A protein has these predicted regions:
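RNA substrate-binding interface of SAM-dependent RNA methyltransferases
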Residues: 6-118
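Secondary-structure junction/capping motif
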Residues: 12-13, 121-123, 177
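Active-site/ligand-binding-proximal alpha/beta "capping" segment
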Residues: 111-173
């Protein structure tokens, strides 16, 4: 039988969620609800102001995601990044094309978390965050973008982001799970 029925509230716009945010996380097409929930929990615990999810990302309100998040999905502001065509239909190509531009227009430096040759280290990103405002490399508002399990971020996202950042690895390990890497990045950029 049914335990309860609930009405889902309408999601706010990206601009509303990011209005007073200084640090946001973006989940690009993360489909494993365990990872969605873990990222939400880490974001809440490590002072991320908001979480944005792309249209193909798993639902943070899905039962497994909500359980893994330990309920923090109901505490941290979040919304889906969506855009609409002139006729009112959803624009399936809004992310990453106009979506990244929207974040930039809101004053965010967009950071693709990816293992690329041109990536800077997480330590360098942290230095830029804490640099004096007059330093030309200073970052004021930060949008950390995390990619799906296996494939990572799309090449379109990496190409459009302001910076690409990697977490240095040891012992021949090539990468971390998205939930682990997000926690490391959230902690380092506090």
């Amino acid at each position: 039988g049914a335990l309860c029925a609930m009405r889902r509230w309408p999601l706010p716009s990206v601009a509303e969620v990011c209005k007073s945010a200084r640090r946001v996380a973006v989940m690009e097409n993360i489909v494993d609800h365990t990872n969605v929930g873990a990222l939400m929990r880490s974001a809440a615990a490590l002072d991320v102001d908001a979480v944005l999810v792309t249209p193909s990302c798993g639902d943070p309100l899905y039962r497994r995601a909500a359980r893994v998040s330990m309920g923090t999905v109901f505490q941290i502001p979040w919304t889906r990044i969506t855009g609409f065509n002139d006729d009112g239909t959803e624009n399936k190509h809004y992310w990453p094309f106009q979506g990244i531009d929207e974040l930039k227009s809101l004053g965010f430096t967009t950071v693709a978390m990816a293992l690329e040759d041109r990536s800077i280290s997480l330590d360098e990103l942290t230095r830029r965050l804490h640099a004096p405002a007059e330093d030309p490399t200073h970052i004021d508002k930060l949008a950390l973008i995390f990619g799906t399990e296996g494939d990572g971020l799309s090449h379109h996202t990496i190409a459009r982001a302001d910076l690409t950042v990697k977490i240095p690895m040891s012992h021949g390990v090539d990468s971390l799970n998205v939930a682990a890497s997000s926690a490391v990045a959230f902690y380092a950029t506090r």
